[in-house]
Design a protein with these regions (language model features):
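A short beta-strand-loop structural module common to alpha/beta enzyme folds
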Residues: 24-39
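A general structural signal for well-ordered alpha-helical segments in protein cores
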Residues: 15, 39, 43, 66-67, ...
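Structural motif
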Residues: 2-3, 55-59, 76-79, 96-100
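Non-catalytic beta/alpha edge segments that cap or flank active sites
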Residues: 17-22, 29-30, 84
Length: 145
């Protein structure tokens, strides 16, 4: 499964660290530190890929705005995670396909643990969780044009 990365200036340093751990990840930008860049640009690039079913996404900004942008795309379930247990549950219970890490509040070692937990987690396929995902899909179908 491909993993797409995106970050603004507040997440840039952490994204560069993440690329060292996830060597096969595809970096969609920013490719250089730019204090004037805007988080929606890079969140949208990642979310487009995930929305089309091309892989999973990890977006990094300061405090969570990239998750807001990613969730504007059909088939995207982006969750902001500060802890590995939250990331594990986001994948298992909510089929999270875009992980958002707030670089202002998460150090690189913690980010590595969060990503590892999220990547290793499996989506729960029992009736209860599938029912909830189906309801989410129905809401999405009604509200995304």
């Amino acid at each position: 499964m491909k993993i797409f990365l995106g970050a603004d200036h507040r997440g840039f340093k952490l994204k560069e660290k993440i690329k060292e751990w996830l060597k096969a990840a595809v970096d969609l930008g920013n490719d250089q530190f730019d204090p004037d860049d805007d988080f929606p640009d890079y969140a949208a690039l990642v979310a487009q890929k995930v929305s089309r079913g091309e892989g999973l996404g990890i977006v990094i900004c300061g405090s969570g705005g990239m998750a807001l942008v990613a969730n504007k795309f059909k088939n995207v379930r982006a969750v902001e995670c500060w802890h590995e247990l939250a990331a594990k549950h986001a994948k298992e219970h909510d089929a999270c396909n875009v992980l958002m890490i707030p670089a202002d509040f998460v150090i690189p070692l913690q980010a590595k643990k969060i990503i590892k937990a999220w990547l290793e987690a499996k989506i729960l396929v029992d009736e209860k969780h599938q029912r909830r995902l189906n309801k989410l899909k129905q809401i999405e179908e009604r509200n995304f044009i």
